[in-house]
Regions:
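Residue-level detector of conserved catalytic or cofactor/ligand-binding positions
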Residues: 223-229
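Active-site loop/oxyanion-hole signature of alpha/beta-hydrolase fold enzymes
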Residues: 80-120
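Conserved catalytic-core motifs of eukaryotic protein kinase domains, centered on the activation segment
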Residues: 62-64, 89-94, 155-156
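Conserved hydrolase catalytic core segment
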Residues: 115-158
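Alpha/beta-hydrolase fold catalytic core
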Residues: 1-50, 74-76, 114
Length: 229
């Protein structure tokens, strides 16, 4: 009982402190009411449309594109979106599959952008864009991928160990506790230093704070899509 009480107290502490800095920007933001939930997005600039889609790491959000979007908006209408389950978007309790994101991207372009658009995506999200283009080539103009996943890795099916991890992490108390231990500030700092950046001096504390906040919005995550590294 004492152990469970300790887990509960720790979870409450993380929930109350992780988002108090309000680091996720809402300027120029709106919500797209999609069939599975509300999706936060921003629209800036004028010109040919460009959609920026972030990675699916548990701490990812459209903050990933904050510097790039400022440059692109000088010549383009730039859209960024927080994928469902990420950032300021809704985090419904459902299975987050690749095909669900393909549907979301397709619907967003048709309903919000309403014209053929170029898409820039990173890591696993690149696969969503490729599939969306295969299903409907009329919605995407050009595709640019940053550090995309290999096609061989996309062939892998979830094994029993992966399913067990997902079952544990989805437990209301214990799963949340484990997730909070995994997605702590020190771990996020290591991700930036050894995965995201080759020049640590370029890492800003504001960016790390934004990722930490995104990782703990509503205590839900995409850990069943992309486990923390």
């Amino acid at each position: 009982v004492a152990t469970l009480a300790g887990m509960y107290a720790y979870n409450q502490f993380v929930a109350s402190t992780s988002t108090k800095k309000n680091m996720l920007p809402t300027k120029n933001g709106s919500y797209y009411s999609w069939k599975q939930g509300n999706v936060f997005y921003t629209k800036t600039g004028t010109g040919d449309p460009v959609l920026l889609i972030h990675d699916t790491n548990s701490a990812s959000s459209s903050v990933e594109w904050s510097k790039i979007s400022k440059r692109l908006q000088k010549k383009h209408t730039v859209y960024t979106m927080d994928l469902l389950g990420c950032g300021l978007s809704d985090k419904p309790g459902l299975s987050y599959t690749n095909y669900m994101y393909v549907q979301l991207i397709t619907a967003f372009i048709k309903d919000i952008i309403k014209s053929k658009t170029s898409v820039v995506a990173s890591n696993l999200s690149s696969s969503f864009v490729i599939m969306a283009n295969q299903l409907d080539a009329s919605i995407i103009d050009k595709m640019i991928f940053i550090n995309p996943v290999s096609f061989h890795s996309m062939d892998a099916m979830p094994d029993q160990q992966s399913k067990l991890k997902q079952t544990i992490i989805n437990l209301p108390l214990v799963g949340t506790f484990i997730y909070n231990l995994l997605m702590n500030p020190k771990r996020i700092d290591r991700q930036f230093r050894f995965i995201y950046y080759c020049r640590p001096q370029l890492i800003s504390s504001k960016t790390k704070d934004a990722y930490y906040e995104a990782a703990h919005m509503d205590n839900l995550s995409l850990i069943h899509i992309s486990e923390p590294t």
